[in-house]
């Protein structure tokens, strides 16, 4: 068996490779990989995220998604599906079950074991700290089902404001009184000034964002 001849753009002459076969650098994303998708997928899920209802930070006023004026992508034909918290049969999706197991929940409602995929609709994703020291509340995270405290991949964390303090001024009246009629004094108060820019208020604290679909690789 001869050694293959390989030409590249860096040299004008062919050269022989020292490898019997050229290595494959990228074989594609692994099963269980999650990626943002800018297009519209079908079907659009309208079910409520029930995982967060188990937590103290459940939201209300949910609204079902609507179709945008854009093409619809049927991503499941390409091995991807929307991260919408659905249950799948382990016998039908053995590769994905081998990755997720019962991490996000499982049940035996039918003759076959079913496992749940993560539900990332309307959520921001954060890298698992894994001892990196960047998540000061890591020990208070909730497990992927929202039922118990657990610092694991897939765990949940409620929205919050960092603990802080604000100084403020107090006017303390003082005076000397003598025998005679009672004297009175008034206490002045101060308030914070108006913000330089009109403040934006909403039902949650959030950064600027763009809505995307999070997809998970199942085959």
UniProtKB/Swiss-Prot annotation:
<dbReference type="InterPro" id="IPR037053">
    <property type="entry name" value="Phage_tail_collar_dom_sf"/>
</dbReference>
<dbReference type="Pfam" id="PF07484">
    <property type="entry name" value="Collar"/>
</dbReference>
<keyword id="KW-0614">Plasmid</keyword>
<protein>
    <recommendedName>
        <fullName>Protein RhiB</fullName>
    </recommendedName>
</protein>
<feature type="region of interest" description="Disordered">
    <location>
        <begin position="174"/>
        <end position="201"/>
    </location>
</feature>
<comment type="function">
    <text>May be involved in plant-microbe interaction.</text>
</comment>
<dbReference type="InterPro" id="IPR011083">
    <property type="entry name" value="Phage_tail_collar_dom"/>
</dbReference>
<feature type="compositionally biased region" description="Polar residues">
    <location>
        <begin position="174"/>
        <end position="195"/>
    </location>
</feature>
